[in-house]
């Protein structure tokens, strides 16, 4: 079976490519390299012994997307990661997010609808829930008004897919991630932000390694036990394995609806300060940090109820927060050595 992975050299994408190849899939990767590098291919090869087929392609270029699918008519499924993904940046540059995250999806769906049957796994986000009215978050909670343009693009993306599946032969699984962290245990691939990191853990590890003087903690006045925001931090390898299970479900026609939705998290919320303490424990060092104002678009807390994924997919996150932080630290040390 051949699977296309868009954004397949990115953080989650590269780990998913590894798991797909480990399960025997033929993988084709496209990426525009805007937030990653070709060196990731070497890491994938080091882990799996195989380099996936790769094309540099910007999914905002409709003609190039059309040409790609003309040349790859034997693709059985698509896992669509390619997107801009930072809440804060999306507030500052919303049009970039609508262009990257909506146009690319539409162009892919336009090509998939030409096929007699097509399957897509969509990289969605817990941001679609906004500040949910109850915790933990279940899939049947109503989607709230988005707190950021990034979150809005994920809501719109889900709606576009749902509308499209009603009138085409496309089947879809929407995977709502919570907060992916960590790296492959081999430290051959990991999170590699170009420029200033947009996520907490790379900021922590870069501060720990000495690239940054101190970590900025955005807000300590949230209504949480220690005042800092709470998120559900899931090891990226656990997340990647869920994608393999999801694509197998579609390819084996085990899906029970044209569109299925699953939360992917650990089911446990951790505050920013708890993540810092986990890093300090695994690294053996004290992390310098300062409290600064909240970021626009950030919510108080979000953690998953994963019963549906556990029961229907037979998937459950395995790694602890400390294990994820240890793998992230191992990766940071390797790339700076």
Regions found by a protein language model. Give the residues of each.
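N-terminal Rossmann/SDR dinucleotide-binding element
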Residues: 1-77, 196
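Acidic/polar helix N-cap motif
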Residues: 60-61, 93, 305, 320
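N-terminal Rossmann-like NAD(P) cofactor-binding module of classical short-chain dehydrogenase/reductase
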Residues: 76-79, 121
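Conserved NAD(P)H cofactor-binding loop of Rossmann-fold oxidoreductase domains
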Residues: 82-85, 124
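C-terminal substrate-binding subdomain of Rossmann-fold SDR/epimerase-dehydratase oxidoreductases
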Residues: 203, 209-337
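Catalytic helix-loop patch of NAD(P)-dependent Rossmann-fold dehydrogenases
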Residues: 92-95, 99-107, 119, 128-174, ...
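Rossmann-fold NAD(P)-dependent oxidoreductase module
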Residues: 15, 19, 111, 160, ...
